[in-house]
Amino acid sequence: AQNKGPHKCGGVLRNYSGRISTYEGPKTDCIWTILAKPGSRVFVAIPYLNLACGKEYVEVQDGLPGAGNYGKLCSGIGLTYQSSSNALSIKYSRTAGHSASSFDIYYYGDS
């Protein structure tokens, strides 16, 4: 079940809205790319983030993977981001041997 639904490690998400959740498998880096319709923007909300700082982080990238980002996040409440185009990427990274902390990231595109 680790490669299905919101618990998958990375991939391209084309749904209008959805959720990215904790990945607990063996990979240490996961990148999700959210693609909205051309001309639309992507909105991301992280209601609560409490990762083990120094051992794991989430990075919100404004565009395709490798685009400019808003920094490495390991904690926060009520975090929101908006893309400048129809693409936004989320990277999750953790140190090998460190078990993943739980998180939920919600996204949606404007129509």
UniProtKB/Swiss-Prot annotation:
GO terms assigned for molecular function: heparin binding
Residue ranges of domain CUB in the record: 9-110
Residues modified to N-acetylalanine: 1
Gene3D superfamilies named among the record's database cross-references: Spermadhesin, CUB domain (2.60.120.290)
InterPro entries on file: CUB_dom (IPR000859), Sperma_CUB_dom_sf (IPR035914), Spermadhesin (IPR000124)
CDD domains: CUB
UniProt main location, coarse: secreted
Disulfide bonds: 9-30, 53-74
General function of this protein: AQN proteins mediate the binding of boar spermatozoa to component(s) of the egg's zona pellucida by a carbohydrate-binding mechanism. AQN proteins are secretory components of the male accessory glands being coated to the sperm surface at the time of ejaculation. They possess as well heparin-, serine-protease-inhibitor-binding capability.
Compartments reported by the entry: Secreted
PROSITE patterns attached to this UniProt entry: CUB, SPERMADHESIN_1, SPERMADHESIN_2
Presence of keyword Acetylation: yes
GO biological process terms held by the UniProt record: single fertilization
Family matches, as Pfam families: CUB
Similarity comment: Belongs to the spermadhesin family.
Name under which the protein is recorded: Carbohydrate-binding protein AQN-1
UniProt keywords, alphabetically: Acetylation, Disulfide bond, Fertilization, Heparin-binding, Secreted
A Gene Ontology term for the protein's cellular component: extracellular region
